[in-house]
Amino acid sequence: MSDIAERVKKIVAEQMGVDLDKVTDDAKFVEDLGADSLDNVELVMAFEEEFGCEIPDETAEKITSVSDAIKYIGENME
């Protein structure tokens, strides 16, 4: 597992209060992990802080799964 993927999964597990083993690449934040809109905002903020990148609102709305976050961060990390 890449360092980015590992860090994303750790953030998701911590923010969502779920076990790390439930945070799979294809886990969707809302459907699989029980996130609400506030959780999504907090996840994006945590990703921005951890990886030193800015995620525009229109892009953040499209990040709905762990794999979406890993892909975006991998392509846009400073």
From Swiss-Prot:
Compartments, record wording: Cytoplasm
Keyword Transit peptide: no
One GO molecular-function entry: acyl binding
Residue stretches making up the Carrier domain: 2-77
Keywords linked to the UniProt accession: Cytoplasm, Fatty acid biosynthesis, Fatty acid metabolism, Lipid biosynthesis, Lipid metabolism, Phosphopantetheine, Phosphoprotein
Coiled-coil portions: none
Keyword Phosphoprotein: yes
GO BP terms, alphabetized: lipid A biosynthetic process
GO cellular component: cytosol; membrane
Sites of O-(pantetheine 4'-phosphoryl)serine modification: 37
Chief location of this protein within or outside the cell: cytoplasm
PTM (free text): 4'-phosphopantetheine is transferred from CoA to a specific serine of apo-ACP by AcpS. This modification is essential for activity because fatty acids are bound in thioester linkage to the sulfhydryl of the prosthetic group.
Domain of life: Bacteria
Pfam families: PP-binding (PF00550)
Biochemical pathway: Lipid metabolism; fatty acid biosynthesis
Role of this protein: Carrier of the growing fatty acid chain in fatty acid biosynthesis.
Assigned protein family: Belongs to the acyl carrier protein (ACP) family.
Protein name as it appears in the record: Acyl carrier protein
Organism: Magnetococcus marinus (strain ATCC BAA-1437 / JCM 17883 / MC-1)
Lineage of the organism: Bacteria, Pseudomonadati, Pseudomonadota, Alphaproteobacteria, Magnetococcales
Gene name for this UniProt entry: acpP
